[in-house]
A protein has these predicted regions:
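Structural motif
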Residues: 23, 56-58
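STAS-typified acidic loop motif
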Residues: 3-40
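Amphipathic alpha-helical interaction surfaces in cytosolic regulatory modules
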Residues: 42, 58-112
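Short, well-structured hydrophobic secondary-structure segments
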Residues: 31-56, 67
Length: 132
């Protein structure tokens, strides 16, 4: 399976998926006009990879803003990863948030509270730091 890179737009996040590394990054703003049209293809590839692979998974969220439709897509992904983690797979989520962005931090806390087995880290971005 090849690397997937969908650049961010004004309404959609960047999606970067490297199946060999087991790394998915979702970054930016997410309020697409048609959430299914935007996410179905990429999430289908991720789900296919989850079915075919047993390797570790790292999911980095670097969100600036997301609407409720995008949040539902993310919850479905987190539930799927949580089920994989319950079976013993190494699954980890890093939810990056700016130190001043309490709304995004709070949303990350809500997502974290929905999973039982998944390692879910809230990661504060410090000015000048870079991460991937």
């Amino acid at each position: 399976m090849s690397v997937l890179l969908i650049p961010a737009t004004q309404r959609t996040p960047e999606l970067a998926f490297d199946p060999d590394a087991g790394h998915l990054r979702i970054a930016g703003e997410s309020f697409p006009e048609d959430v299914n049209a935007f996410f179905d293809g990429p999430m289908g590839r991720v789900n296919e990879w989850l079915d075919e692979s047993q390797g570790p998974v790292l999911l980095d969220f670097q969100m600036i803003y997301l609407n409720s439709s995008s949040a539902k897509v993310f919850v479905k992904l987190l539930v799927r990863l949580d089920a994989q983690a319950a079976l013993g797979r190494d699954c980890r989520v890093r939810w990056w948030h700016d130190a001043e962005d309490f709304n995004i931090r709070e949303l990350g806390e809500e997502f974290r509270d929905r999973v039982d087995h998944l390692r879910f880290e809230l990661c504060e971005v410090v000015a000048g730091d870079t991460h991937s």
